[in-house]
Amino acid sequence: LFRFIDTMEDHQKVLIFTINSENDFKNVLRIETSGIQKLLMQIGIPANMLGFSYIVTALELIALDPDYLNHITKGLYVDVAKKCSSTAARVERNIRHAIEIGFLKGDLEEIEKIFHCSSYSDKGAPTNSKFLAEVYYYMVNNEL
């Protein structure tokens, strides 16, 4: 069960949905678009990059259906492309470029906090799927 709420005052899109746990308790997860944007900017991904908006859209879709993390190429990129009037190849490339810029010029402390890794500079940026999964689970675990 999910629904979008668009508040009139600040025009923030808020996604609210319910997850049924094994014990049949209902947990409500609230992910705000502004929270996603703020986290990406803290990492160091510039908001003016096309990949930035694709990552935001991708994380919104993953919040609706975490199974997207198992179908990045043939599911997530295709659906992001549809929502953004683009192609799956452009979505993949722009997300990859935004991640690379973020890891090249971004805030290492923030990157280490989310990715639990101290030397991405040696390894380069994570793959798109690893990045999206790590950011998604960070947001879920920290209720952002």
Regions of interest found by a model, annotated:
Residues 73, 82-84, 93-96, 100-144:
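C-terminal engagement/docking regions of AAA+ P-loop ATPases
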Residues 29-95, 99-103:
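C-terminal output/effector regions of signal-responsive regulators
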Residues 11-14, 46, 68, 108:
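A general structural signal for well-ordered secondary-structure junctions
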Residues 1-27:
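N-terminal regulatory/sensing modules of transcriptional regulators
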Residues 7-10, 20-21, 32-34, 65, ...:
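Serine/threonine-rich low-complexity intrinsically disordered regions
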Residues 20-23, 27, 48, 70, ...:
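Detector for Asparagine
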Residues 2-5, 59, 95, 136:
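A generic alpha-helix structural signal
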Residues 10, 41, 45, 60, ...:
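Generic surface-pattern signal
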